């Protein structure tokens, strides 16, 4: 895993911040509900493009059939129940205030990355850094595709149907794809400098719940933080642009009763007004 920044920031509304402290958790939402409409599909599209390039250069009928079947099987990967909780390496970001917080009612919660990784790991979540550069994404995708093809060709029994062989064996390669695909985002989002907690959670897992989204119900999984006993997790609370900075700051001190906030409360310095 890449060395994470000392502190990662979760941008949310005042209601969301209350929810974090009241439930002692952050919520990881189903990846397909994120504001990037191409979430997860981006890596699938890139993999299919590369597989198509390899297929065009291969005259072996069995190899071509395996390649095409693997490309088709990516639809099954897209249906995996992958959940993500999002953070930014930037503490006071205009794009984050505008994108993830309601007008005049935004907060960011600063959490120590190493400690966040420690508490989330036993719950099935990894802390990963998002990749926006296509030049960095491509080798990862190509390595996965080449390895999968090599293994599928090597294990194809004599006289066996290549398509059925791929259908039987391709789930072995899904975890590898699911490990990197949630980190790959369109470069239009690079200013977010995003890190994520990522986990695969079956649909029948009792932790799965529903919350109200802007236009639909969104499945989510709470990731327990242990704020009352963990003295090393919370770094700060920052209040976003609001017409009542002093009142908002005074009210936020009540969170000190719930958890140790090591660097106290900060105020956004961005001269932005959205009320």
Give residue ranges: language-model regions.
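Partner-binding and oligomerization surfaces adjacent to conserved cores of proteins
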Residues: 1-275
